[in-house]
Structures are given as C-alpha cells and as structure tokens.
UniProtKB/Swiss-Prot annotation:
It is found in: Cell membrane; Endoplasmic reticulum membrane; Lysosome membrane; Early endosome membrane. Residues 66-145, 228-427, 503-506, 600-619, 667-673, 729-832 are cytoplasmic. Changing C144S: Decreased palmitoylation, abolished localization to the plasma membrane. This is Mechanosensitive cation channel TMEM63B. Changing A575K: Increases calcium influx induced by hypo-osmotic stress. Changing F569A: Increases calcium influx induced by hypo-osmotic stress. InterPro entries: Csc1-like, CSC1/OSCA1-like_7TM, CSC1/OSCA1-like_cyt, Csc1/OSCA1-like_N. The chain crosses the membrane at residues 41-65, 146-178, 203-227, 428-457, 473-502, 507-543, 567-599, 620-638, 642-666, 674-702, 708-728. Residues 748-767, 776-818 are annotated as: Disordered. Belongs to the CSC1 (TC 1.A.17) family. The lineage of its organism: Eukaryota, Metazoa, Chordata, Craniata, Vertebrata. GO terms for cellular component: actin cytoskeleton; alveolar lamellar body membrane; early endosome membrane; endoplasmic reticulum membrane; lysosomal membrane; plasma membrane. Expressed in cochlear hair cells (at protein level). Highly expressed in the subfornical organ of the brain. Expressed in small intestine. A lipid is attached at C51, C126, C382, C398, C726, C729 (S-palmitoyl cysteine).
Length: 832
C-alpha cells in the first residue's frame, strides 16, 4: 500500500500546480505566516524572550514572598528514612529550626534544603539560579531517587545529540539549502533556509538523505550510551517477591506458605501477604486524621485566646459574607469532635470488616532470588498440549484449595510503586472503566485537537475579520504558536487525569499510560495535522477515508514543504523554550489546584492542612511526553528546515535547568520501574524515523518514487521499521537496539539469605518496604490487628501522596509549637 501511495504521490505531484492556495485555504489566514520577513521568527523570538524575563522576575518575587505554595510540605517516609544517617551531622541546623529532634516527621521539601550549605546558597533574590548549577547528581539521587537521576541523564544525552545535529544541520545542511535558487533571492526570505529552495534534480539532495540516516545512527548511539550508564538498581526484596493473582479469595497465608514449601524443596517462604480491599479504609483513615488535626488546632487556639472559634462547615463557607439558612456557623471544637467520633466509628467498623474483603491476590516473599526465578518460570512456561498452552506448576496438598491452575504469577513491583486502593478495581469493571474514559478522551480531542479549530469557529462569527489584512507577525505567528503551546500544555493535564481515573495498580503503569497517550496526541496536535494543513483529527480522518484521497494526497503532503511552513514550527519551539519552561517553573496548574483547595477548605485548620500537603510526585510520564514531542518536531524538521535545531537545543537546555530545580525543590520523590525510561527511549528513536518519512515524501513529490534518492530513503526507512518492530515484538536485533541497560541489585547476599550476619526476616524489613497497605501497617502497630514482627506503632507511616496521609506531630511537639516554627521559618526567609 505504501509504495502504491508514494507512486501515486509522485505522479500527482509532478502534474500538480502550485499548492500554496490550497494549503492556505485549509488553514485560517491568521495561523500560517505568508510572506513576512524571515517568517516572523525575530519578532516572535523577541516577544517570547521578554515574556520569559517577565515570568522569571515574577517567579523570583513569588519565591521570596509567597512561601505557602510549595513550601511547608511534608516529605514521605522513604525520604525521612534516607536522611536518618545524614541527620546525625545536621543537628545544629535542625535544632535551630525545629527544636531539636522534632524534625523526624517534618521537613521542608522545597526552596531550602535540610542541608546547611544549600540553605545558605539560595537565600538571595536570584541566587536560586546559581544554586541550580551546584546541585550534584548524588544529592539529587539522595533527595529525589534514582528515577530523577535517570531522567536528567536522559536529558543530557538529548542535549549532546542536539549539539551534534545542530553543528551538522547549521554548518552543512543550511548552507546547502542557501545555495539553491528556486525561491526568491531575498535575504529576508525564510524559505531560502529550507529544502524547498533546492531544485528537484540537484545532486545535493543526496546529502540530506545521507544526513537523515546519520541522524538515526547518532540517535541510537546516544540512547545506547545513556542506557548503558543507567545502573538501574532493583531492591533485593523486589527480586525475591512474586505477585500472585487468581488465588482463592479465602486462602490463608499459612496455606500459601505450605504450598510452596511442599512443592519446591529447600524453599523458604519468609512472608505471604494476601491483599484486601482497603480503598474505603484508607479514605476513612485520612479523613479521621484530618478531623483529629482540626480538633487539636482549635483546642490549642481556644486555650491560647480563651474564645471559642466559630466556623461554617460547608465547602467555601469562609468565603460567604452573609448567613443564609443551612449555612449557619457552628462551634469549631464541637463540630470536629463529633466528626472525629463518627469517622473513628466508621473506621473501626471498616477495619473489622476488611478481612472479609479478600481480593484473591497475594505477595509472596522467598528467601533468595534463585528459587523465586524458578517458581516464576514454572508458572509462565508454555507447554502446548492440543489447543491449550499452559504451564504445569508443581502441585502440593494445598493446590486444589488454592486454585493454582488459575494463578497468574509475575514479579512484584516495589511496595512504594503500588496503589493499594486501586487493587480492588480489576477485571471487567476495570476494562469497562478504561474504555469509557478513553472514548470520552478521544471524542474530546477528536474535535479540539489544534487551536486552528477554535479560531476557525471565531471566524464564523467574524471575530477575526478586522485583523485579517494586518499581516502583522504578532497576529499571524506569535498568538497562534502561543495558542498551540497552551493547548499542548493543557493536553498532558487532561491525559494525566484520564490515566488517574483509570485506576492503575502501579504508579509506573499510570506514568507509562500517560506518556504514550500524551505523546501520540501531541504528535498529532503539534506536528502532523498542522504540517498537513488540517485543523483537527476530524478533518484528518475525513480526508484519509475520502474517495478523493489519492487525488488530493500529493497536494496535502506539499503543504509540509511550503517555505513558510517551517517558520510555524520554529516559532512553536521558541514559545516552548521560553514561555513553556518559565511556566513549568511557576507550576501554574499546581498553583491553581492549591488555590481551589484553599477555597474549598472549611476552616483555618483545613487551610493549614492544605498548605502542608500540596506537594506531589513528579509526573515523569507527562514530562517525557511533552519533552519528546518538542524533540520530535525538531528532529523531523532538522533537515528540511535546519534553522529549528538551535532553538530546539535552547529548549532542552532550559528544560534541563528547570527540571533540576523542580525535582530537587518542588516535588516528592517517585519510585518507578525502568519501563517508563525505556518507553522514552523508544520515543526518541521515533523522531529520526519521522525525519526519514518527511524526506521520503519530499523526494517522492519532487522527483517521483522511482528516483534514486526516493528509493534509497524508502529502503532505509523500511529496514529501520522492520528492525524496530522485530526488536519490540520479538526481542531480536538487541545489538542494534537503543537499549543497553545494566541491572544492579542492592547489596544483599541473596544466595545465603543473610544480611549483616542475620537472616532477612520479615521483621528486618522497614515498614515502608513491606507488601502491605500502610493503613494495615498502622493497624498492626496500634495493636488492633494480628500484629507483625518488627511492626511498631512508634514508626511514622509513609505515603506517596501528601493528600493520602495526615501525620500527627511527634511526642514533645505540640501543634502550636509547630505552627510557631512554620511562622518563624517563613518570616526568617522572607526577610533574608
């Protein structure tokens, strides 16, 4: 089909007239630049740079005076545990800020590190700019986790790749394009920098094809170099734990242990943890702690001021300026006391019933990795017998009761990677939920894919008629590219929430889904549809399945190579580099959510709780997708419009600096698996493949499909696609792959199953590293559950999101003391 289409394109293109009017008629006149000096790039560059400076100035002001946003967040339990060793040498700093040892539960996540030198290095108005360059990878790994280091290393390799591509494109390809004389001989003509300036029979077109293939090789080499340095560490606990689905719902942990120890000689099961439906229990636990905190806050306030506080318990009640029926004020302590008692009772009843809600899943931890791998292989090996393809696991006296023939066995994810509240959503319900969400998402983006359709709708009401003939670069190029950036910035947020409501079992799965969906929609929105002169997916499919598809295909693909078309994407990359990265620094979506939550808070206690709990995990999926979208645009046009590469390099440099700041100062650490990083590598390889596609279409339309340059590009493209498909689907061509990971394990003697001379019993595992929901760990620690070795109620709970957990202050630190600590910290930093 592809050769037939290309041959038709070549024949039609050779006979077609100038497609300029056709392409421009498909767009609105204000979205594509027509005949402006150098495509309006200097004007857009100046405007975006001024906006960038203004946003940086605004950020510096907000950073100095508005510390409530992103300032007083609690760190996760994992972060606290990683810092315990360092805290011994930081007692002087912590004592001055948090009254001695009281820092165990409370640490500031943003802006100023718990390290003394970092507290001193970014106190000034703009000193945070230099602090970004002083942050070392070891400090980022310790503060943000290994995934943040892999992400930043990925960016550095992309920057190195763009440096090489930029030198080749600007130093060689750009002068070659200038040497043509097909377009007007005007120094201000943007078209002279593009491949459209070369005649169809020019032998210099071989240079473009060769460079496209070279860029592909450079991309693969760069990614192999990146992945070879990714010493991805997997915890010993993860490699020794299996996740089993399909167990009998009423199977006991002792029977699971007995099955494995009978079926596999020399097998020791350290722990077998059945899974329960804890979604409602986790919700009640979080609400109960919020109520306790609210009562404590107003109790301390009343003891201090001797005046009972009154609140409006309705959402946004503190914003009401008049008292209406149903919104009367109530006494705060009485309200929170009743609420706490009700939630405690609901929590107690739910906790008693949780053992009656098994999910038919279990996490089983063995004594070493070898036996774990053997068991996994037994349950996943394929032995074809007739029409069935099923492994034959070893049997035991408990096999029939446990329904081992229905088991699905995989390696367990990291405990911090699991959404425990989502495990109850599975099977048909999960697939139906996922289908409905994605259908709604597709319908939404089907019609609202690009900003062109919005402006086209405005044209129907003659809104844009007065500016139609201005031919001003601000009107024709700055606002359309800014609007395109706004839509592309909104898309990851929409896709993220769609992935969130899909209720994935792991954070890695949620991030991978977000990354792939975002990247696909962004490529359509930002690259494919604007290049083809289409305004939405609606028009794309109508054109694709129209009877006149082949007749109009050549003209549509001619739209890609119009002289002024590249200017639109150059200006988009400029907008992403300056305005996009500045907005990432300001974190406007998070700020808006923070303001909404403050408005919905019912009292001062809840507003203070919001201020402490507004930090979230860094969304690697959305960040990878957006960054790879811009990189794909740059690589796709790196040969047809080489002037885009320096601006792409500028985008990546600013993006790297902004992400270093945000990862270290603004977001919670996230624990993911390596699949999210390998998925990003696959998206990188897609960029030079699209560049080959662009050159193939250009060569086919200019010289025909049978021309040597067209055939060479086609053969290279087919071979590349075949190798990629064989590697992704069947695991072949590993030495030609962009992946070259090296897996390392944490230093634990897995074979002897001993750690520091002692066997790794369940009691030796930290609470945050146990395969049990945190709310059940707390129950065991309180003595309300069956108990577990090593569990202690004195250990603070951990959480992955600060909205899930509200930690109580440690012994010896009252709520009033903590409030005074907050106030003194903020006041001290504002006046520095």
């Amino acid at each position: 089909m592809l050769p037939f289409l290309l041959a038709t394109l070549g024949t039609a293109a050779l006979n077609s007239s100038n497609p300029k009017d056709y392409c421009y008629s498909a767009r609105i006149r204000s979205t594509v630049l027509q005949g402006l000096p150098f495509g309006g790039v200097p004007t857009v560059l100046a405007l975006d740079f001024m906006c960038f400076l203004a946003l940086l100035f605004l950020f510096s002001i907000l950073r100095k005076v508005a510390w409530d946003y992103g300032r007083l967040a609690l760190v996760t339990d994992a972060d606290r545990l990683r810092r315990q060793e360092r805290e011994r040498v930081e007692q002087e700093y912590v004592a001055s800020a948090m009254h001695g040892d009281s820092h165990d539960r409370y640490e500031r996540l943003t802006s100023v590190s718990s390290s003394v030198d970092f507290d001193q290095r970014d106190n000034g108005f703009c000193s945070w700019l230099t602090a970004i360059f002083r942050i070392k990878d070891d400090e980022i790994r310790d503060k943000c986790g290994g995934d943040a280091v892999h992400y930043l290393s990925f960016q550095r390799h992309i920057i190195g790749l763009l440096v090489v591509v930029g030198v080749l494109s600007v130093g060689i390809v750009l002068p070659v394009n200038f040497s043509g004389d097909l377009l007007e001989n005007n120094a201000y003509s943007f078209g002279r920098t593009t491949i459209a300036n070369l005649k169809s029979g020019n032998n210099l077109l071989w240079l473009h094809t060769s460079f496209a293939f070279l860029y592909l090789l450079l991309t693969v080499y760069s990614m192999r170099r990146h992945t070879s340095k990714m010493r991805y560490k997997e915890d010993d606990l993860v490699k020794r734990t299996l996740f089993i689905n399909g167990i009998s719902k009423y199977a006991e942990s002792e029977k699971i242990k007995k099955h494995f120890e009978e079926a596999y000689p020399n097998c020791t099961v350290l722990e077998a943890r059945p899974c329960y439906n804890v979604a409602r229990l986790m919700f009640l636990d979080a609400e109960r702690k919020k109520a306790e905190r609210g009562k404590l806050y107003f109790t301390n306030l009343q003891s201090k001021e001797n005046v009972p506080a009154m609140i409006n318990p309705k959402p946004c009640g503190h914003l009401c300026c008049c008292v209406v029926r149903g919104c009367e004020q109530v006494e705060a302590i009485e309200y929170y006391t009743k609420l706490e008692q009700r939630l405690k009772e609901d929590y107690r009843r739910e906790k008693e019933k949780v053992n009656e809600k098994p999910l038919g899943m279990a996490f089983v931890t063995f004594h070493n990795e070898t036996i774990t791998a053997i068991i996994l292989k037994d349950f996943n090996v394929c032995k074809c017998q007739g029409c069935t393809c099923r492994g034959e696991p070893r049997a035991s006296s408990c096999s029939e009761a446990l329904h081992i023939s229905n088991w699905t066995v995989t390696y367990a994810p990291d405990p911090q990677n699991i959404y425990w509240e989502h495990l109850s959503i599975r099977g048909f319900i999960w697939w139906l939920r996922c289908l409905v969400i994605n259908v709604v998402l597709f319908i939404l983006l089907f019609f609202l894919t690009t900003p062109a359709i919005i402006i086209t709708t405005m044209d129907k009401f003659n809104v844009t008629k007065p500016v139609e003939y201005l031919n001003n670069p601000i009107i024709t190029q700055f606002f359309p590219t800014l609007l395109l950036w706004c839509f592309s910035a909104l898309l990851p947020t929409i896709v993220y929430y769609s992935a969130f409501f899909e209720a994935h079992w792991t954070r890695s799965g949620e991030n991978r889904t977000t990354m792939h969906k975002c990247y696909t929609f962004l490529i359509f929105m930002v690259l494919l549809l604007p290049s083809l002169g289409l305004s939405s997916l609606d028009l794309f499919f109508r054109w694709l399945f129209d009877k006149k598809f082949l007749a109009e295909a050549a003209i549509r693909f001619e739209c890609v190579f119009l002289p002024d078309n590249g200017a639109f994407f150059v200006n988009y990359v400029i907008a992403s580099a300056f305005i996009g990265n500045a907005m990432d620094l300001l974190r406007i979506p998070g700020l808006l959510m923070y303001m909404i939550r403050l408005c919905l808070a019912r009292s001062a206690a809840e507003r203070r709780n919001v201020k402490r709990h507004q930090a979230y995990e860094f969304q690697f999926g959305a960040a990878y997708a957006w960054m790879m979208c811009v990189f794909t645009v740059v690589m796709t046009y790196s040969i047809t419009c080489p002037i885009i590469v320096p601006f792409g390099l500028m985008y990546m440099l600013l993006k790297h600096l902004v992400d270093r700041y945000n990862l270290y100062y603004a977001y919670l650490p996230a624990k993911l698996d390596k699949k999210i990083h390998s998925g990003a590598v696959n998206q990188v390889v897609a960029a030079p493949i699209l560049c080959l596609f662009w050159l193939l279409f250009f060569s086919t339309m200019r010289t025909g499909f049978l021309a040597p340059t067209s055939m060479f590009t086609f053969v290279v493209l087919v071979i590349t696609i075949v190798i990629c498909l064989c590697h992704v689907c069947f695991g072949h061509f590993k030495y030609l792959s962009a992946h070259n990971y090296k897996i390392e394990h944490t230093e634990t003697d897995a074979v002897s199953s001993r750690s520091n001379g002692r066997p790794p019993t369940a009691g030796a595992v930290p609470k945050s590293a146990k395969y049990i929901a945190q709310v059940l760990q707390d129950s065991e620690g309180d003595g309300d559950g069956d108990g577990a070795p090593g569990s202690s109620g004195d250990e603070p709970p951990s959480s992955s999101s600060q909205d899930e957990e509200l930690l109580m202050p440690p012994d010896g630190l009252t709520d009033t003391d903590f409030q005074s600590c907050e106030d003194s910290l903020i006041e001290n930093e504002i006046h520095q």
